[in-house]
Amino acid sequence: MPEKEVFSFREAQEFLEMLDNLSDDTINQRICIKLMLLTGIRNGELHGLRWSDVDLKNRILHVRRNRLVSREFGIYEKCPKTKTSLRDIPMPDNLVDDLKKYKEWFRLADEHFDEKQDEYYLAVGLDRQPLYPHTIAHILTKLEAKYGFKHVSCHGLRHTYCSLLISQNVPIQTVSKYMGHSDSTVTLEVYSHFIPDTQEKVVFALNNISKK
């Protein structure tokens, strides 16, 4: 299977720094892109997220549905195709802090927002209405070009999330769980080249075993 275009650890840091320096006038764009990079969710899962799926207190994102588009059906929602795609993903502090600001942005437009969180999607335009499912991909491409980053697609952000976790020695079973893969074999097949070289550890272990 061919390798995917991803950000390296350093590139991801620089990309996040760029996002964090964007004006709060585009907080909706920043949040959507950071959600894909920092939780590994698919584009359809991003557009299916509602505020009732966000647990800021426990720093958990609940992935429960996809919001997709096709010529035959137009824009529609569906449950993930596998049970493992229904998952809870931990969120880092930086993302949680941004989501708190984002929630205030919604409250500015609707004083009854807290009572209607199941009605509001996270991937929205400035009017707080749901974005067309392909919009974030176009925004991402424009930002990368404007600020001199290589092109990494929405799915590439998901691959980046996975590769960064693996390179930081997060257990493959844990990575597979948060990616929503059916089992860790799928994760290994696609991302094995990101696993850190453990040759020295293997030699050290074998030397200990073979000592007399």
Enumerate the predicted regions with their spans:
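Short, basic (Lys/Arg/His-rich) helix/loop patches that form interaction surfaces
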Residues: 17-29, 39, 89, 105-121, ...
